[in-house]
């Protein structure tokens, strides 16, 4: 019995010790769990701070209760979503900046108070503001429209404005400005966008078109009036042998001049519409020019009204070039004819030619009337004449130099004139030249053989 009692007491004490040890273990585990939770909470808190700071690279990996695990996984997912969103925003920003940078139109944006928050380089150049800080400046001040418009006008009316501006090079520009509102999804207006389109060339072309139509009308009206007058005189009975032949001759001359003008206009139209193409061939340019000058020498013997001397001032060596011989003949003929027309009787006309590494330079000089300084920049304009009455009397259409300029441009060259009034003029043509072109062609032929 005693032994049984002792055994019972021992068992009871052992159970008590186990319970005590179990309690201590539970308390210890709870304390450890609480400490681990605190560490994990600190890690989660740090992760949130990293997200706020823009660091999305760290990934949490925690073991524990389901709630902690869920929070950790959600934070990792949120971090990845934010990272991808940030990358997309950066890519869109770069794409937008690239588009704005390469746009030929100027673009600027404002906040709701009309202050500039964005402007591209084109707009800065158009407004002459490259070196100025324009952010936060008023759009009204920037466009110089504060005297005529208020910000409310731009918002409520979104007008289209035509402005005169001066770019960074001091060139005057015509700008067409269009406005658009920046709206949020709620409809709240948060600012304006203005697009500046340079219409300088368009306005210039429109002015030239109007002037061209006016000139064509005038140039055709003058000979038509003459022809009409003479035909009316003939119709009314002026058919006697002493008068009628002169009337008919003048009518034919004016008709021929109109035909030449129409032909020149059609030629220019084909060039403008890019339907006039060069038929190039490889020729000896020295022989080509010499042939033209020989033709003019033969004409000189038949010319009764005007005597002139053609001087060749160039070496007789081969200059091989690819040109359209018909069109280039038209250019040289026109310049030589003008030199003869405006030179005094017995005048000297000098033709010079030389080459550089990559250019052929042809110049034709005369000692004629010359061109006034104020007229020199416009002599290649269509229908422009220094002396309209004299040019018309000599049968000119006023289009010869315009056509010459366009033909030279088709050959990727350029033409200009220097002149001193009363002393003469020099017309210079520069064409691209490759001195090795013939060597290469001969070498290719030898290889093919």
UniProtKB/Swiss-Prot annotation:
Effect of residue 33 to A: Reduces transcription of the peptidoglycan hydrolase pcsB gene
Parts of the chain on the Cytoplasmic side: 35-449
Effect of residue 217 to D: Severely reduces autophosphorylation
Matching Pfam families: CovS-like_HAMP, HATPase_c, HisKA, PAS
Consequence the record notes for mutating residue 23 to A: Reduces transcription of the peptidoglycan hydrolase pcsB gene. Does not negatively affect WalK expression or membrane insertion
Its membrane topology: Single-pass type III membrane protein
Function of the protein: Member of the two-component regulatory system WalK/WalR that regulates genes involved in cell wall metabolism. Functions as a sensor protein kinase which is autophosphorylated at a histidine residue and transfers its phosphate group to WalR. In turn, WalR binds to the upstream promoter regions of target genes to positively and negatively regulate their expression. Required to maintain expression of WalRK regulon genes in exponentially growing cells, including peptidoglycan hydrolase pcsB. Phosphorylates WalR and also capable of dephosphorylation of WalR.
Protein name: Sensor histidine protein kinase/phosphatase WalK
Native species: Streptococcus pneumoniae (strain ATCC BAA-255 / R6)
